[in-house]
Amino acid sequence: MITNEFDTITAIATPLGEGAIGIVRISGSKALAIIKKIFKGKNLDDVPSHTINYGHIVENGAIIDEVMVSVMRAPKTFTREDVIEINTHGGVAVTNEILQLVLRSGARMADPGEFTKRAFLNGRVDLAQAEAVMDLIRAKTDKAMAVAVQQLDGSLSNLINNTRQEILNTLAQVEVNIDYPEYDDVEEMTTALMREKTQEFETLLTNLLKTARRGKILREGLSTAIIGRPNVGKSSLLNNLLREEKAIVTDIEGTTRDVIEEYVNIKGVPLKLIDTAGIRETDDLVEKIGVERSKKALEEADLVLLVLNSAEKLTDQDRTLLEISQNSNRLILLNKTDLPEQIETDQLPEDCIKISVIKNQNIDVIEERINKLFFDNAAIVEKDATYLSNARHISLIEKALKSLQAVNDGLELGMPVDLLQVDMTRTWEILGEITGDAAPDELITQLFSQFCLGK
């Protein structure tokens, strides 16, 4: 469907359901005219911008709800258009009724993410900042929120824009040397100077790329597979980490017949905990499917928590699990330390963590070891640092580095500086896709379609 970018749009901006407040948002040139048709209270033409005004929403003289209406005039709004927010009593019926009234009064239903898209199109935010809005909404921990806020505040955008400007200056210098070789007041872009500039850009982007692992973990969570043979305490460990009972815990082997996924906040790091079915040979078809899914989860995990029974000697199944997980980021947990120890610790390859999920012992040690393994006990989010957390951004930085490598390769082959402009220009264009300066319309539409309705 083709829609007019300048239509006045509306949507419910709060989750549907029972609650104290529901918000119907309107943005566009007709926002004030629409609210005046349905609002009984102060004359909204006379109220200052960025004020909240008491009154009623009415239709044909009948009161629909008692409301507070926020009036925010362009250009000092999120969309840089006139914005009205109707604060209703929360509830499905009343909020939907007011939304339908706004639609009948001349607004169009907003597409998902269209408010933020307008903020981008009107220059209020760039594409990286717009994506940070969604990251902020989806953040599962305070550290993930901090990274999203940094990006929303422009830390990544400023770094990218400054780098693009330096690349542009380099390209301009090459052009001047070509077109006006007689100018003595412009430094000549020699091979040595081009190499120096290229290495400078490579170093900056390489250092930025080094933050991707940490940033991506904070944004998407640390995929953590809990593995072990049946009935060693995997589900109990999951419940202990979650601080609530999510998995069924029994003495019957094979109780967990599928893969259970839950998120938990470990010192600011979101862990996507995957409680796998015990990996063993089985004739039970349903359990067999669960075992296969467990093996797949193990292959894809960022972290493996291997649970062994310290009250029993190592079994063939234990040894198989030790072998198939040896190339993973792994912590070995010896459970049931409240019972006499039987396991052969001298045959285990790493320092193990002795725990008792029944008595909730040493769960905090697991959390500390995870922090050490992935963050070297450093501050998880450093003040004033810039982090890459978005897979799209990471891919573009990698592409930009490949273009810079092509410039270096050309320099090594003795190619003239002016012939290397193509790859340097490509680097500039690729970085522009991060902020949206050089992003195709199809990409922009696709990105905003992933946003919430009303955002």
UniProtKB/Swiss-Prot annotation:
Its EC number is 3.6.-.-. Its cofactor is K(+). Gene3D superfamilies: P-loop containing nucleotide triphosphate hydrolases, Probable tRNA modification gtpase trme, domain 1, tRNA modification GTPase MnmE domain 2. One of its GO terms (cellular component) is cytosol. Mg(2+) binds at residues 235, 256. It is found in: Cytoplasm. The keyword tRNA processing applies. Exhibits a very high intrinsic GTPase hydrolysis rate. Involved in the addition of a carboxymethylaminomethyl (cmnm) group at the wobble position (U34) of certain tRNAs, forming tRNA-cmnm(5)s(2)U34. Belongs to the TRAFAC class TrmE-Era-EngA-EngB-Septin-like GTPase superfamily. TrmE GTPase family. This is tRNA modification GTPase MnmE. It comes from Streptococcus mutans serotype c (strain ATCC 700610 / UA159). The lineage of its organism: Bacteria, Bacillati, Bacillota, Bacilli, Lactobacillales. The gene is mnmE.
